[in-house]
Structures are given as C-alpha cells and as structure tokens.
Amino acid sequence: MTLGLINANPVVQAKKEGLVRREDQYRDDGVDPLEIYDYVRDIRDPEHPYTLEQLRVVSEESVTVDDKLDRILITFTPTIQHCSMANIIGLCLRAKLKECLQLHYKVDIRVSPGSHADEVSVNKQLNDKERVVAALENPNLRQLVDECIYSDEI
C-alpha cells in the first residue's frame, strides 16, 4: 500500500490511440468537443502517473461546446468522492484550455453531479475568476499545475 495517496488503487483504462471526428457541425473558426477533449486528455493526474483520460476523469462525452454562445463546458469525475485533488484537476483543465483557446470562449469547469462530496464548493471555486487567478499566482500550485499539464514534455 502506498502511503499518502487518497486513492491508492485507481481504476486505469487503456489510452486511446487516435480520435475520430464525427460529422463536422461546427463553423470553420470554432472548436468541437473532440478538439477540446484532445487538448485535455493527456493532462497527468496530480496524484498518479496516469492521464485524466486513463483514469476516466475526463471523457469525450464530458465536453460540450456551444459555438453560438462561445461556451465550453467540461465536467470531470474525480476517482473518489472525497478527492482532495479535484480543485487542482480543475485548475489544470482551465490552465490548459486558456493556453490552447481563443480568448472569446467562456469556459465552465464542473465536477460531474454526485461525483464529489463538496461538489458545490468545488464548482464555485473553479468558476470564480478571482479565485482561479489567485490560485495560479501561488508558485507552488502553479508548479503542480504545470507539472500535470507538461508532464510528457518535462
């Protein structure tokens, strides 16, 4: 047993090799859910050496894009209900999308309904601009977020 891990034995899925685009219903300058999923699926979990895709924290179905309103919604599912890393995972998702997307998109990041004991609190924190900026200005949190986002590049 590994000491210090909240979920010492997560369920790990096989990594998908390639993503197949569905019928293109999005305008030329817009994004589609598969593109967004492709941006975030390789983010490493802050607690385990696996990606969010491998742990099924994010999936293709968890991304919604409304190009007419320029809104993106990502719901993620922590591996356990009392996951202490849910806020970090949300910060990683937000930081990665901020890096990859045009500024005009409104991004909402939420934990899947019923998947976390502090769902309301986590959702509120992840979608409060001031809290997100403050968290990402913290050098220790920023380093952890960067390690998760760029783990395959380090």
Curated annotation (Swiss-Prot):
<dbReference type="Pfam" id="PF01883">
    <property type="entry name" value="FeS_assembly_P"/>
</dbReference>
<comment type="similarity">
    <text>Belongs to the MIP18 family.</text>
</comment>
<dbReference type="InterPro" id="IPR002744">
    <property type="entry name" value="MIP18-like"/>
</dbReference>
<comment type="function">
    <text>May play a role in chromosome segregation through establishment of sister chromatid cohesion. Unable to complement ae7 mutants, and thus probably not involved in the cytosolic iron-sulfur assembly (CIA) pathway.</text>
</comment>
<dbReference type="InterPro" id="IPR034904">
    <property type="entry name" value="FSCA_dom_sf"/>
</dbReference>
<dbReference type="GO" id="GO:0051604">
    <property type="term" value="P:protein maturation"/>
</dbReference>
<protein>
    <recommendedName>
        <fullName>Protein AE7-like 1</fullName>
    </recommendedName>
</protein>
<dbReference type="InterPro" id="IPR039796">
    <property type="entry name" value="MIP18"/>
</dbReference>
